[in-house]
Amino acid sequence: MRAFLIGRWQPFHKGHLEIIKKISKEVDEIIIGIGSCQKSHTLTDPFTAGERMMMITKTLENYDINYYAIPINDIDYNAVWVSSVESLTPPFTTVYTGNSLVRELFSEKNYTVKKPELYNRTDYSGTKIRKKMLEGSDWEHLVPKEVVKVIEEIDGINRIRRLSEKDYDEE
């Protein structure tokens, strides 16, 4: 059985890894959708699809998990989004998502939809991790070591800090 899991992975963290490890015990292959792949260089989506692909693939090299990582664009027409996903991915029968819109769209197309249990959401939240990066707090323990290396390679911390700067002083 092949399943689809979509996320923004901004950044890929240990909570994501635990969800993927759990799903991998239930299915033969996982299609990891890199959602909102067209978005980058913002405070909520600082990393490019390619950078997120590196985070995921470099991390999963260390695990016996069969997967495909595929960039998935947002489109402005929800009724055809599932068809767009289907055109970009190998066939799958099951969708794992915690997003109510994604759950509804795939349910309407008769997919089996499962809601994965979040792993320690208190600590493992992309929003909280990005905030820690911005503030200079410790964040490295919340992501796999391979993700730390990717973020260092792309100078991701300084990118986030530059993105938070105002263009002009406000009086």
From Swiss-Prot:
The keyword Nucleotide-binding applies. It is found in: Cytoplasm. Pathway: Cofactor biosynthesis; NAD(+) biosynthesis; NAD(+) from nicotinamide D-ribonucleotide: step 1/1. It holds the Pfam family CTP_transf_like. It catalyses: beta-nicotinamide D-ribonucleotide + ATP + H(+) = diphosphate + NAD(+). One of its GO terms (molecular function) is nicotinamide-nucleotide adenylyltransferase activity. Keywords: ATP-binding, Cytoplasm, NAD, Nucleotide-binding, Nucleotidyltransferase, Pyridine nucleotide biosynthesis, Transferase. GO terms for cellular component: cytoplasm. Its EC number is 2.7.7.1. GO terms for biological process: NAD biosynthetic process. HAMAP family: NMN_adenylyltr. Belongs to the archaeal NMN adenylyltransferase family. PANTHER family: BIFUNCTIONAL NMN ADENYLYLTRANSFERASE_NUDIX HYDROLASE, PHOSPHOPANTETHEINE ADENYLYLTRANSFERASE. This is Nicotinamide-nucleotide adenylyltransferase. It comes from Methanococcus maripaludis (strain C7 / ATCC BAA-1331).
